[in-house]
Amino acid sequence: SEFETRVQNAQAMMRDANMDALLFMTEREFTYFAGFQSNFWQSPTRPWFLIIPAQGKPIAVIPSIGENALSISWIDDVRIWASPNPKDEGISLLAKTLKSLAKSRIGVPMGPETHMRMPANDVTMLRDVLGAVQMVDATDIVRSLRMVKSAREIAKHKHICGLVSDAYETMGARVSAGMSEREILAAHRLDVLARGADTVPYLVSTAGPDGTDDAIRYPNDRPLIAGDVLFIDTGAEIDGYYCDFDRNFAIGQASDATK
């Protein structure tokens, strides 16, 4: 499968980098290698870990609540701990698993656009327990893998971009003076979802005479008037693949300055 190919490619790069294992703890990496999606990632209290050993299939170290859900994925080595358990939120089980696999170096994404989805104190504890086994940066491995998209991935991106583009195309028929940004975005979100998107996690708008220089705030309740330019930025997702692009709409006629 595509997931097996990703893991095998990662393992080849691990060998070249002298890494014994890769450790992932964020939604994007977990989904990329395990093919598992869940809204439970929105909970900050319970971490999830995925380990790619030097050989063989990935190992999941997860809270007990996720055991049944993960069983639908291709991961069959699932190790759980009773959670929530703030005093030991999976760290001892994770350390035990890693020490059985690694004698020298464990790769973890540490570079730009990465983060560790676990408390800083737990990171320190994990390093202490691992002792001589180093945690080293694996950003280049993950970036190199993900920069090359398969035909399936390209089709997913094309599909979600098409859904949002089609929704934008109908915006002119649904937006008029007197409506607020909040009303417009609510209708736009429903339209994108109705077209088949799984989620619309990022949706912002601003409006003002000839436009505004603000592109990140929440919508407001001010009624739009003729001469306003409405900016909408939509980030939507399907099967873990994301699009993010914007459009501008003139309310009534656009002024010469706007044109």
Regions found by a protein language model. Name each.
Residues 1-259:
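Active-site neighborhoods and metal-handling regions in enzymes and metal-associated proteins
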